[in-house]
Amino acid sequence: MNQSVKRIDVKGPHGTWSYESPSWIDRFPIVMGDTYRHGGVSKAPYESLNLAFHVGDEAQSVRENRAIIVKYLGVEPNRISCGNQVHGLKAVEITEDLVGAGAFGEDTAIDDCDAVFTNLPHVPLFLFTADC
């Protein structure tokens, strides 16, 4: 791992889960990171810390995995906000009325949205990436 990225290992109820965060982020009052796939409850082939509803995993497993992450952050799962990413250009500001969009299912996520941002505290923003 290079010096510009730090890895954080967190002991969770289903094993250790990890995320990487850029080292410069420590200068700001935010938490940012990319999670690894271990330490969650999803079964193969999604094992185990799958955070996405749209890939065919059991919805309850995704909810539990998301709860593992936000518990570490000290935030309620119902504040998770995300969009249905479509490889487009649309970015959406998460305002109070959008907090919780996509928290518990793909059907409530913001449509046709590839980026989200906010200035609200305690609102975890989820984006999904793949190794394709």
Regions found by a protein language model. Name each.
Residues 1-132:
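Active-site microenvironment for binding and transforming phosphate-containing groups
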